[in-house]
């Protein structure tokens, strides 16, 4: 019997917890999924430096194809860590690997990390109880937009809820907040249900957890013409029915 750990690295080195670092240093093999989410200062090199161990880079897709290899390491008595930027089980789900390891008699542990989801809610000062389903704006495929984000925001609006909007991340490019809003405006133009209007508020986070992070509240029309810093970015589309304290909180971000 061996241990497999799913380790949250947080958003940057200053959010890497002692618990996570202790587990990484005590593991025999470390796979690092540092591609599904981006950090300003956590990469293979920094992980090698802080753990003193070799790091095996792996995307989520690579981990899925290497499940048998990981199980083989566990079966041989090696303790394995899967290190993930942010939190290991919120945005990037490795449940299949965890349940497979447990079925083979190995111990499974999750070491949570500071996730972009929780961080952005806290920085926005919006009520955490009023968040509905989250959604991702993706790059068009063969010039076709996926209208799921528009539908999710519409449903959340009808329920008086906020929407956390993640932005697509691919090897070919990282989506920025202004591009995502342009896609949402295109969806609005195509569907016309008045879900994304120029005067609607959005909260935009840039490089969360990093020294140069910014979180700002602004109208959609202003965001479309805004020059944002380097990614990663994330967007909250607030409910149109804000509590008085939420309104006051958003003033701190303008």
Swiss-Prot record:
Enzyme superclass (EC): transferase
Keyword S-adenosyl-L-methionine part of the UniProt annotation: yes
GO BP: methylation; protein histidyl modification to diphthamide
Positions that bind S-adenosyl-L-methionine: 11, 87, 90, 115-116, 167, 208, 233
Functional pathway: Protein modification; peptidyl-diphthamide biosynthesis
Keywords of this entry: Methyltransferase, S-adenosyl-L-methionine, Transferase
GO MF annotations, alphabetized: diphthine synthase activity
EC number(s) from the headed UniProt entry: 2.1.1.98
InterPro entries membership: 4pyrrol_Mease, 4pyrrol_Methylase_sf, 4pyrrole_Mease_sub1, 4pyrrole_Mease_sub2, Dphthn_synthase
SUPFAM superfamilies per the UniProt record, alphabetical: Tetrapyrrole methylase
Reaction(s) the record says it catalyses: 2-[(3S)-amino-3-carboxypropyl]-L-histidyl-[translation elongation factor 2] + 3 S-adenosyl-L-methionine = diphthine-[translation elongation factor 2] + 3 S-adenosyl-L-homocysteine + 3 H(+)
Coiled coil: none
Keyword Transferase: yes
Subunit composition and interactions: Homodimer.
Cross-referenced PANTHER family: DIPHTHINE METHYL ESTER SYNTHASE, DIPHTHINE SYNTHASE
Functional description taken from the UniProt entry: S-adenosyl-L-methionine-dependent methyltransferase that catalyzes the trimethylation of the amino group of the modified target histidine residue in translation elongation factor 2 (EF-2), to form an intermediate called diphthine. The three successive methylation reactions represent the second step of diphthamide biosynthesis.
Protein family: Belongs to the diphthine synthase family.
Name under which the protein is recorded: Diphthine synthase
Organism phylogeny: Archaea, Thermoproteota, Thermoprotei, Sulfolobales, Sulfolobaceae
Gene: dphB
